Amino acid sequence: MQLTVWTYEGPPHVGAMRVATGMEGLHYVLHAPQGDTYADLLFTMIERRDRRPPVTYTTFAARDLGKDTAELFKTAAQNAYDRFKPQAMIVGASCTGSLIQDDPGGLAKALALPIPVVAIDLPAYQRKENWGAAETFYQLVRAIAGPKAPPPGSKRPERPAGKRPSCNLLGPTALGFRHRDDIIELTTLLGKLGIDVNVTAPMGATPADLARLGEADFNVVMYPETASQAASWLHRMFHQPFTKIVPIGVSATREFIEEVAKLADVDPTAVLKSYSSRLPWYSHSVDSTYLTGKRVFIFGDATHVVAAARMASDEMGFKVVGLGTYSREFGREIREAAKLYDVEPLITDDYLEVEAKVAELHPELVLGTQMERHIAKRLGVPCAVISAPVHVQDFPARYAPQMGFEGANVIFDTWVHPLMMGLEEHLLTMFRDDFEFKDGATPSHLGVGHAPAPAPAVADSAAVEVLDATTATTTETTTAVWAADAEKELRKIPFFVRGKARRNTERFANENGVATITVETLYDAKAHFSR
């Protein structure tokens, strides 16, 4: 067990809640203690939903453990059916609830409710949230669509002549990163190709919709973390092919269009010619030359990390210096992507390891989750959020997809805005020693009363000459003092690597017994660490 203040994924029953909350007409009865009801806040506070998730908790307390907790679950399940009248119900236990070893599936079956009841058995201490969402969706699809599967060995019937091809969009859930807007973007894009969307699931689907999944010609896997298992099962049982390309970025979107056009047997030429994104021109224009070569570190779920790395490298001219994921189930995909950029993959769910890696690599931009936003802020590095888990500000009121051509536009703006433009950096360098615009100047709108505290005194050249031998002997355990001319020279170094240069120089000075850092020391340190 590990004590931590942050986790990238919750326990697997939170993943099941994401599926249930995204759907309509489905209710989740969760065998859980009072403390596990915190999960409601994820949806009402962070995602800003206007209603509670469709979850009933048994909320047993310590005093109930000496009684019949099984009867408590049966009562909660019956009351949930009587009150909400769902089309289907899923039952399971939270991580804490699983310790008392009741059987929610068997108990619910004993009630003989007149609706489908799907037992979700989630290994709470071996798996996490995304796996729980994928397993829940898979079990629902299998239980509800399974009875309509054709006999084994039968061939899929041909689509009637004149009927438009159709597909299912699989994977979007509640609490997903921009899932709501991605659905709209892909539905519009597929409509331009002459392809109808049969069912979007889990988000927005009812149990009755899940029974119709087999009617589509193929499936679009929007988010492999939650949909790949269900898509593979539909492929085996209904002979429905599914897409492999996630349309995040201009190049990936064009490849996605060609992929679905082949599956649907339609001509994509007109759509490829008519659709365009501003990203390619912006990233090639003179105004965007300051993007080229920016060092970027990427961390998040595997789908968004792999897509972001490709966009950063191929479409925006960034240099990927590190990437990783907290999704151990997709470690293979991350390792393969890391080989393309000649970097070491970071596969961990410990945010402290991620912070240490960012500090080590000194990137100029961090792309990650809400935690990477905090890490980058502490380290003074620009950051943009590309993946769940996210906080409330990343569920915007505006339309802001990540997929498709419009998604590429949104991503370009999101990534570029935290960066300092070339002209801006040039002007800061030009006026760095100006009496009004220097680094330590108080912003004019704050007035004189808000002047910052004076900086620590810096040794001048005279002080360097009068240092005695006694002072020199103590420098091994104290931080070296910066001479005024060295401090001035340091300010000429670009801001995004200035901190690293300062730390390396001070380390060099302390290791070599230099009491006062001069310009010569600064360049000696540079030569030393460049080897």
UniProtKB/Swiss-Prot annotation:
Catalytic center residues: D287 (proton donor)
Pathway given in the UniProt record: Porphyrin-containing compound metabolism; bacteriochlorophyll biosynthesis (light-independent)
EC number(s) given by UniProt: 1.3.7.7
Purpose: Component of the dark-operative protochlorophyllide reductase (DPOR) that uses Mg-ATP and reduced ferredoxin to reduce ring D of protochlorophyllide (Pchlide) to form chlorophyllide a (Chlide). This reaction is light-independent. The NB-protein (BchN-BchB) is the catalytic component of the complex.
UniProt-annotated binding residues for substrate: G422, L423
Coiled coil: none
Binding residues annotated for [4Fe-4S] cluster, in chain numbering: D36
A single GO BP: photosynthesis, dark reaction
Pfam families linked: Oxidored_nitro, PCP_red
Keywords, in A-Z order: 4Fe-4S, ATP-binding, Bacteriochlorophyll biosynthesis, Chlorophyll biosynthesis, Iron, Iron-sulfur, Metal-binding, Nucleotide-binding, Oxidoreductase, Photosynthesis
Keyword 4Fe-4S in annotation: yes
Cofactor needs: [4Fe-4S] cluster
Signal peptide location: none
Lineage: Bacteria, Pseudomonadati, Pseudomonadota, Alphaproteobacteria, Hyphomicrobiales
InterPro entries referenced in this protein's UniProt entry, alphabetically: ChlB/BchB/BchZ, LI-POR_suB-like_C, Nase/OxRdtase_comp1, P-CP_red_C, Protochl_reductB, Protochlorophyllide_Rdtase
Cofactor binding, note field: Binds 1 [4Fe-4S] cluster per heterodimer. The cluster is bound at the heterodimer interface by residues from both subunits.
GO MF annotations, alphabetized: 4 iron, 4 sulfur cluster binding; ATP binding; metal ion binding; oxidoreductase activity, acting on iron-sulfur proteins as donors; oxidoreductase activity, acting on the CH-CH group of donors, iron-sulfur protein as acceptor
Presence of keyword Signal: no
Similarity-based family: Belongs to the ChlB/BchB/BchZ family.
Cited HAMAP family: ChlB_BchB (MF_00353)
Protein name: Light-independent protochlorophyllide reductase subunit B
Catalytic activity: chlorophyllide a + oxidized 2[4Fe-4S]-[ferredoxin] + 2 ADP + 2 phosphate = protochlorophyllide a + reduced 2[4Fe-4S]-[ferredoxin] + 2 ATP + 2 H2O
NCBIfam families assigned: DPOR_BchB
